[in-house]
């Protein structure tokens, strides 16, 4: 029997990124970028995918995100969570991507988007992967964001509140609502 807790356990967990890695990257150490990438790619992929709902768009946004991290490491001042800085860069590139796409959407792109839905290739269990892919379709964008920030990035509620600019009650209720929707969805599939 599969439950929401088992599915969430399959999400990639974010590893902490020390400020020193970003400072080292700012000084030209390209090995630091490789380490940042390795520690953040799975959680960041899942988060951006929760926003775009399209693996191709997600890959484009992530490429721009990591280039920006390399180019702007010197502007990072530390003191905050490094992953919050990285997630904010990814969110900004996602928003820019949506603006660009809105201006040039075509029938071909819409067909491509339908074919390229969620891809949870990082989830090893094939049954869990298929359930996650279908379950994500039932959540609203903000519910997906909150779920991923909590379950994948391991953020505390107050960190999610600060990041999204929402109040605590909204974050808590949307998280609970997303869990309930997933539980109901899984009940239908079993």
Spans of model-derived segments:
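Short, charged helix-capping/linker segments at alpha-helix termini
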Residues: 8-9, 26-35, 45-64, 168, ...
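Intrinsic, short, N-terminal disordered tails of RNA polymerase sigma-factor systems
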Residues: 1-23, 35, 133-141, 162, ...
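Sigma70-family region 2
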Residues: 26-27, 53, 64-81, 100-101
């Amino acid at each position: 029997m599969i439950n929401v807790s088992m599915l969430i356990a399959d999400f990639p967990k974010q590893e902490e990124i020390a400020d020193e890695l970003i400072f080292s990257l700012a000084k030209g150490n390209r090995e630091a970028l490789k380490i940042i990438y390795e520690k953040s790619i799975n959680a960041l992929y899942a988060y951006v995918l929760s926003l775009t709902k399209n693996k191709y768009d997600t890959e484009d946004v992530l490429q721009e995100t990591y280039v920006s991290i390399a180019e702007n490491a010197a502007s990072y001042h530390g003191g905050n969570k490094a992953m919050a800085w990285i997630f904010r860069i990814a969110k900004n590139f996602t928003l820019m991507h949506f603006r660009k796409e809105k201006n040039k959407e075509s029938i071909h792109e819409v067909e491509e988007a339908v074919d390229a839905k969620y891809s949870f290739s990082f989830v090893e269990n094939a049954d869990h992967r298929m359930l996650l892919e279908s379950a994500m379709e039932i959540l609203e964008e903000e519910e997906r964001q909150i779920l991923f920030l909590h379950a994948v990035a391991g953020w505390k509620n107050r960190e999610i509140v600060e990041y999204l600019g929402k109040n605590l009650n909204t974050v808590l209720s949307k998280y609970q609502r997303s869990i309930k929707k997933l539980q109901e969805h899984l009940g239908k599939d079993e």
